[in-house]
Amino acid sequence: MLLSKQQVITCDDILLSLCDSVTDVLSTATGDKISYTPMIQKINNTTLRPDIGTFVLFTGTFSGMVVLNFPKETAMELYTCYMKLMGLSDSDLATNYTSEEVSNTLGELLNQMVGNFTAKVSTTLNGRIHQSQPKMLALPHQVEININMTLDHPEVSRITFFTNGGNVFYLELAMDHTEFKLARELTPAERPLTPEEIMAEAGLV
């Protein structure tokens, strides 16, 4: 995404960029079609919910936290699709969502999703963002854990995602209220290359 001087990037734009990273990484990693609702839900705080709650912190140009909550059916669908695409047979797969292998797989996927997001946003905003290692918890149905990052003016949002198998999972993003706008035109060295320019540099066009 290239910025113009008239364009303002808001927290919602950053959230949608994160959602695109989630769908791109998960769809590629699992071969499953992942989509998300066009509705952004504003909430008061981030919460780890059953059956598996995962989160990652990021700091730098802006700070925040990403939370993903997976019902057990969704966790097993994504885990199974990912491992089968890696070449594992049914007999080699974990059969319970509480298995450490399932949690580790979801953590690895979350790391890839947030890594894709931070790289993309760092380029777009000419900034730098660092992410923590993902943490995850398998939670019983009666347990929810509020998990908050210290922010001056928090904006917290939730988006619902859908898998090809008809299951759902939920993404929550907490970050300080912020806006970005271009103060001066980017020089060619600073400006992200367009797909056409990348192909031209590689001699493909």
Segments (PLM) and residue ranges:
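Composition-driven recognition of glycine/serine/threonine/acidic- and proline-rich low-complexity segments
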Residues: 2-205
